[in-house]
Amino acid sequence: MNLTHIWKTTLSALQSQTSRHDYEALLRPAMLLSLDNGIARIGVSSPIQKEGLENRLLMPLRNALTRVVGYPVQVQVLIANQALRPEVTAAPRNGTHVALEPEPFVTEPPTPAFTSGNGNGERAVQLDLASAMRSGMLNPRYTFASFIVGSSNRLAHAACLAVADNPGQAYNPLFLYGGVGLGKTHLLHAIGNRVLDRDPEINVLYVSSEKFTNDLINAIRRQQTEEFRMRYRNIDVLLIDDIQFIAGKDATQEEFFHTFNTLHSAAKHIVISSDRPPKAILTLEERLRSRFEWGLIVDVQPPDLETRTAILRAKAEQMSVHVPDEVIDFLAHKIQSNIRELEGSLNRVAAYAELNRLPITIDTATAALADLLGNQRRRRISAEAILQIVSEHYGIEVEQLRARNRSRHVVVPRQVAMYLLREETESSLVDIGNLLGGRDHTTVMYGCEKIAEEINTDSHLRSEVMAIRERIQMMRGL
């Protein structure tokens, strides 16, 4: 296996063992730089990420890598700045990603390059860390060419392509929303990569809302707020991921409001992603909500069967692994939640087959994914837990779902609860009616059918149901 395959398989294994926050903030932006003589060198972009990996995830990371490669592995975590320090005295050219600027408290010795080898005489491969850590800003693998287009994401793909070809023009801001692992981050990176391919002098910055918040906190602590503002307000294209996490953070929202205004008034392009539409982000300031709605809002839906099949075939080709059509079909039918889990399942199957020297068959896939498929069969969640999740999502009390209140702000959440109870539990219509204040089973049937019909035409409602379902999956530990 090459480094990319090893790292993807490791991430797939760790995704189910770590919190979403740790996975997104610490693991996904990291990169396996080399694996030589039993030492895996992991590259990260900041001291915060390094500290988080070493303090919270070092043991799980070491164990996962050991399982993937089949022999004991030690882990070293290295910061991109270590390799960049010899060059940082030169002024960066336009288009250079400012996230790689050196931190004053990084004290590790500089490491100009790394080698990777399999310990069996394979030629060492030189890796330029600055290029490798571009994945912390723009991942060169995430392009429009590598994005599989289907009915679930065609509009989002077209809008992103239009922005990349004409930044600062139409669809500003562009707001993408949808569930976890559906390709929003891929599209953000694809925009940035295409913009820079067409004009390397354009300043592009990809950043998560969490990093924006952390940078602001650090700037305030170090009394460097002006430097922070210069960094974020002197760019041509801002790509900001998971904006929902700034909700409820007053200082972050205030700073982002002014950043947005500065960039937008200068005809700089802003592309934002979220797991829900602006109207559904509770505690988001109204002035930000209205600005997010100035441009185009597009939802990214879960892939249909044809798209899942195409994604798996493209992934197998990228991995240079032959996967029989019947196995592709098996995975496409079994893994329906999101693209990340779909690709992760193929990584696991390929790694399992290689490590056990087995052909890739449906039996091999079933064995490799036994825990995942077993969870799908055994998964249970209480009806009360679903009611709690629904009520928290809509900002109401569970008792309001049970009451006779017929105002729309309660009726819709109640019908969503009926629908999800029917879909996610084995409760009968009568059981659901009793749970919701003794309602007749025909009322429950009407509510379920109404939501089932409207999610096909109402993108806002569909995103609401998707977001709630994701919380249900997280509670199940899937």
Curated annotation (Swiss-Prot):
One of its GO terms (biological process) is DNA replication initiation. CDD domains: AAA, Bac_DnaA_C. The keyword Cytoplasm applies. Residues 71-136 are annotated as: Domain II. The keyword Cytoplasm applies. PROSITE patterns: DNAA. Pfam families: Bac_DnaA, Bac_DnaA_C. Keywords: ATP-binding, Cytoplasm, DNA replication, DNA-binding, Lipid-binding, Nucleotide-binding. Transmembrane segments: none annotated. Residues 354-478 are annotated as: Domain IV, binds dsDNA. ATP binds at residues 181, 183-185. It is found in: Cytoplasm. GO terms for cellular component: cytoplasm; plasma membrane. InterPro entries: AAA+_ATPase (IPR003593), Chromosome_initiator_DnaA (IPR001957), Chromosome_initiator_DnaA-like (IPR020591), Chromosome_initiator_DnaA_CS (IPR018312), DnaA_C (IPR013159), DnaA_dom (IPR013317), DnaA_N_sf (IPR038454), P-loop_NTPase (IPR027417). Residues 137-353 are annotated as: Domain III, AAA+ region. Plays an essential role in the initiation and regulation of chromosomal replication. ATP-DnaA binds to the origin of replication (oriC) to initiate formation of the DNA replication initiation complex once per cell cycle. Binds the DnaA box (a 9 base pair repeat at the origin) and separates the double-stranded (ds)DNA. Forms a right-handed helical filament on oriC DNA; dsDNA binds to the exterior of the filament while single-stranded (ss)DNA is stabiized in the filament's interior. PANTHER family: CHROMOSOMAL REPLICATION INITIATOR PROTEIN DNAA (PTHR30050:SF2). Domain I is involved in oligomerization and binding regulators, domain II is flexibile and of varying length in different bacteria, domain III forms the AAA+ region, while domain IV binds dsDNA. Belongs to the DnaA family. This is Chromosomal replication initiator protein DnaA.
